[in-house]
């Protein structure tokens, strides 16, 4: 009888731990937006986005500080609504997409700032250089798809900024843009 009670208690501890373990999600590339804007010669802001976004999120709702995120952007997917400018941005003057095909962000720490908000610090790797960047993140919601109760989605919005000069984007000043680049991010992710 003691063995049965002990076995039940041990099993209960493992089940309790599993109930509070982080959930894994895959970013839905059809519902992911990584936008940016930067100074355009003082006239206004130049806007753009990356069309190819992928990544994973490990989301621990019980202790958000134990969560992690990894995102990859295909540099060649940059879109500024101007094909000539897109081609120039992909060149060695800016993103050098042929030599550095991916831009990545990998979280290193998370600080909870509210019930649904956090500061996510991570390493942004651009042009082969990694620097810390802080994102202000809001968890928007999580629910099953209205047309498919077996598919669970969660959604996040984030903002942040960095200096393109810190990553060696060589020609920003020559074209009167930057150096600061503001990020505007919205992602939906599907629970695995």
What does each model-found stretch correspond to?
Residues 16-18:
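N-terminal signal peptide c-region/cleavage motif recognized by signal peptidases
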Residues 20-192:
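Low-complexity, acidic/polar, glycine-enriched regions of mature
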């Amino acid at each position: 009888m003691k063995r049965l009670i002990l076995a039940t208690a041990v099993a209960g501890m493992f089940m309790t731990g599993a109930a509070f373990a982080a959930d894994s999600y895959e970013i839905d590339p059809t519902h992911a937006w990584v936008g940016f804007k930067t100074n355009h010669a003082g006239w206004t802001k130049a806007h753009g986005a990356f069309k190819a976004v992928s990544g994973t999120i490990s989301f621990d709702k019980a202790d958000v500080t134990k969560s992690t995120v990894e995102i990859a952007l295909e540099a060649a997917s940059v879109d500024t609504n101007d094909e000539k400018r897109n081609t120039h941005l992909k060149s060695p003057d800016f993103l050098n997409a042929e030599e550095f095909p991916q831009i990545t962000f990998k979280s290193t720490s998370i600080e909870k700032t509210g019930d649904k908000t956090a500061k996510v610090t991570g390493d942004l790797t651009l042009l082969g250089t990694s620097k810390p960047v802080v994102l202000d993140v809001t968890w928007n919601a999580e629910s099953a798809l209205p047309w498919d109760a077996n598919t669970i989605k969660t959604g996040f919005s984030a903002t942040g900024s960095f200096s393109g000069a810190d990553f060696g984007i060589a020609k920003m000043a020559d074209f009167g843009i930057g150096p600061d680049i503001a990020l505007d991010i919205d992602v939906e992710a599907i629970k695995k």
